[in-house]
Regions:
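Charged helix-capping and loop-helix junction motifs
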Residues: 1-4, 32-40
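Acidic (Asp/Glu)-rich catalytic clusters
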Residues: 4-13
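His/Asp/Glu-enriched, well-ordered alpha-helical/loop segment
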Residues: 18-28, 36-123
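Short, glycine/charged-enriched secondary-structure capping and boundary segments
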Residues: 31-32, 67-70, 136-138, 156
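Active-site microenvironment of metallo-dependent hydrolases
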Residues: 91-171
Length: 171
């Protein structure tokens, strides 16, 4: 049934939004053990050509008061709950919080191109893999070509045996 439904979703050009934070906490919480993860069939939907994006709709409310609005955090959690940890799947996760979401919202001027609104973020990561793996800091948020938010990354120092070393966990 699910396979047939995915074909219908794709032909109807419907969009699927998965919300990893609240879904992982709220769905199936009355199940016995082993408990299901509360996550949809993301990999199967993507393989069927369905547009899937990641949402984060509960920030500080009664259903999920632990949210902080990090889309990279939501992608990281989905990476675990949907078992999308392959190197080739990291790009799909990033697309789900950018390109696929823009498609869901019918944004026509999306992307970095002449004439578009120049909305983008600068991440503290050397690779897309590290961006998702480390849920790195967003150094800059640029909206309509102007910096609207700037974050100084945290600095971690390990002190051991009289030595101090800076640790960033990057590969």
């Amino acid at each position: 049934y699910a396979f047939k439904l995915m074909g219908v979703l794709q032909r109807a050009s419907l969009n699927i939004i998965t919300n990893p934070y609240p879904n992982s906490v709220l769905q199936n919480r009355t199940d016995g053990y082993p408990r299901r993860r509360g996550c949809t069939r993301v990999d199967e939907l993507l393989a069927a050509g369905v547009n899937v994006c990641i949402g984060h709709d509960d920030l500080m409310d009664p259903w999920y008061p632990m949210g902080k609005g990090s889309m990279l955090g939501a992608a990281n959690l989905l990476m675990h709950t949907a078992q999308l940890s392959g190197y080739d799947q990291i790009g799909q996760l990033l697309d789900m919080i950018t390109v696929n979401s823009a498609r869901t919202m019918c944004l026509e001027d999306y992307g970095i191109e002449e004439g578009n609104s120049a909305d983008f973020v600068v991440l503290d990561a050397d690779t897309p893999f590290d961006a998702v793996r480390l849920t790195c800091e967003c150094l800059y948020v640029v909206r309509r070509g102007k910096i609207v938010c700037e974050t100084a990354p945290a600095r971690r120092e390990l002190r051991f045996g009289g030595r101090t070393e800076t640790i960033d966990f990057k590969l």
